[in-house]
Amino acid sequence: MLMWPQPHLPTHPHLPTHPHLPTHPHLPTHPHLPTHPHLPTHPMMSKETRQSKLAEAKEQLTDHHPQTNPSVGTAASDTKKKKINNGTSPETTTSGGCHSPEDEQKASHQHQEALRRELEAQVHTIRILTCQKTELQMALYYSQHAVKQLEGEARDLISRLHDSWKFAGELEQALSAVTTQKKKADRYIEELTKERDALSLELYRNTITDEELKEKNAKLQEKLQLVESEKSEIQLNVKELKRKLERAKLLLPQQQLQAEADHLGKELQSVSAKLQAQVEENELWNRLNQQQEEKMWRQEEKIQEWEEKIQEQEEKIREQEEKIREQEEKMRRQEEMMWEKEEKMRRQEEMMWEKEEKIRELEEKMHEQEKIREQEEKRQEEEKIREQEKRQEQEAKMWRQEEKIREQEEKIREQEKKMWRQEEKIHEQEKIREEEKRQEQEEMWRQEEKIREQEEIWRQKEKMHEQEEKIRKQEEKVWRQEEKMHDQEEKIREQEEKVWRQEEKIREQEKKREQEEKMWRQEEKIREQEEKIREQEEMWREEEKMHEQEKIWEEEKRQEQEDKMWRQEEKIREQEEKVWRQEEKIREQEEKRQEQEEKMWKQEEKIREQEEKIREQEEKIREQEEKIREQEEMMQEQEEKMGEQEEKMQEQEKMRRQEEKIREQEEKIREQKEKIREQEEKIWEQEEKIREQEEMMQEQEEKMGEQEEKIWEQEEKMQEQEEKMRRQEEKIREQEKKIREQEEKIREQEEMMQEQEEKMGEQEEKMQEQEEKMRRQEEKIREQEKKIREQEEKIREQEEMMQEQEEKMWEQEEKMCEQEEKMQEQEEKMRRQEEKMWEQEVRLRQQEEKMQEH
């Protein structure tokens, strides 16, 4: 049987101790045995695993002996030499072949020193291992704690990301609603422009008809003037005829008077017929003028209604623009909230980076410790081989040195008591630390996996944040410019309203028109810039969406997302082309509007000129009507006189002397009657024409009456407006100064906008470069993911190896327990041998005493 010294083995409870031999009260039970109070048995481990772990622990403890105890080898060599020289076994007791007591004491003393050194080396290794365990447990604990914090922060970040996604979706819905409203407004404006075009055509036709009617009225006025001149001549002729009649009554006889009276009567009849025809023509023309005036009034009413509708629509559009501005303000506030959230996220990211750096340091320490362990394992394997050789030599020496060790054990036991007390405390601390380290190690491995994933995500986020900061700076500049442009647009709209009210005087001022044209051009440029900015914002938002989707689906669907990205880029390009086409259409529509407005201005000027001419015609017509009434009164007086003359002529016809003349006159009268009938037929035709003209004139007179009423109202309004215009002129002069200042500012802004456009072009190029970089980064990320997966597989393999090692440790522990039991049995045998040795010594002493007596 091979014997191995175990100074820390307990005594057997059932074996009686020798009366002369000291017991081992200071030796506690082995810490790896199941009876140890501080090391509970693992519930999931079998006996084989415990035995294997105990065996491995013993091997690790014994591996340090050859390095730390060089004296052991020397002692073994000395004993070999003694064995060779003596050539006898230790059990012989003859005087010639046995060793001297001094040599035996020296050998036992050397053997005890070697054992002490071995014990010290074992204690030292145990302390080193306990320190390493405590360090590992602390590192695991800190890493697990950091991982828990990182998980909580990651959850917070995920919840915030979900909130931001929801918020972005709401913003997109609001933007889509705004765009739909804008589209509806644009359609409504297009319909209004079409209606304006139709009205402008109607106005143009009406102006043409008005011009024709004016020409006809001018011709009629000329005819009326001729008729009036003829009437005046006829009246003069009538007066002269009356005078002649009066003279003829005095001078000429009755027959001559009758002939002249007949002649005058015929002339009067012809003149009266002409006057009636002219009166009927005048009535017809008056009716036509009335009808035309009525049409003009109706058209003006329609125009006013359309203008009211247009104003209402403009008010609606303004309300919509105000709503859009409110929505934009809300969007800005929400973006500010997002900025604040992102700043918080950045701070948290910085904290995470600091924690990650600490974890990396811990990982480096762990790697160093693993290297040290590997080196120690190699050394242990080499030392095991050496120790096996030395054990065989030491076992032979142990038989000889057991007698001498007993005397020295008493001194060692006192020291061992102190050592065991310290070791018990150390074991208790080690158990606590080991449990903590195990938990920390498990958490450390989990954290490392998560941290590596997060590192890649954070790197991508940092780049995205840098890009977002640049974009936001640009957006802030654009928003400031838009605010300035909105302020300018409001001022311009106020000026436009005043200009629309001041149409009569602003038309005379050509400079203001030039200013308006400049403002319109500037507005077009501003709108184009706004549209470009909105397109860019949409592009950025779409890119942000794409980045968020890439972050979420990076591990599972990156290839699908890349395909979608390409498709979306093609769609965006198509949308940009559509937007450019829409912009061109809008520009063409605006040019058409400007042309239509110029036509409207011209038509309104013509209408006003026509109104002035109509007023002059109305005044002339009134004067003519008064003259006609006077003529009618004169004609009535003449008819009464002619009636009296006819009565006198009838009395004269009775005169026989006048019968022949009367017959001749009758023949003439018949001829005249035929002529008169022909004239009457012509007159009837003229009367029908005149009636038609009178109906037209009546309609025109009705229109003119309505127009006069409106004109009176308009004149009153115009007087009020003139007062307002005077006040407004002063304001306009002040505004002109402001406008000039604004024009200078706008020119500066245009220059700034051109610079910005150049910068935007550069930024677009940079964005393209960044997209290429992002693609490269994605490829790198994929490679990194592959590496991470490989590392994860390695880690899993290492974990499996660790589990296998733990099982082996348990098996070694069980083996150690079995070996300890065997050692106890060996100790019992050693004690029995010691008792026999004591008996032999007693016998030897008795023999020596007898020898001395002899």
From Swiss-Prot:
- List all disulphide bridges recorded for this chain: none
Q: Which domain of life is it from?
A: Eukaryota
Composition bias, Basic residues: 15-35
Establish whether keyword Coiled coil is in the entry.
yes
**For bias kind Polar residues, which ranges apply?**
67-77, 85-97
**Keyword Transcription on this protein?**
no
Coiled-coil blocks: 103-854
- For bias type Basic and acidic residues, the affected ranges are 45-66, 100-114
The segment annotated Disordered runs over 1-114, 320-348, 366-447, 481-568, 581-681, 714-854
Keyword set, alphabetical order: Coiled coil
- PANTHER family reported for this sequence: GOLGIN SUBFAMILY A MEMBER 6-LIKE PROTEIN 1-RELATED, TRICHOHYALIN-RELATED
Q: Which family does it belong to?
A: Belongs to the GOLGA6 family.
Its protein name is Golgin subfamily A member 6-like protein 22
Q: Which organism encodes this protein?
A: Homo sapiens (Human)
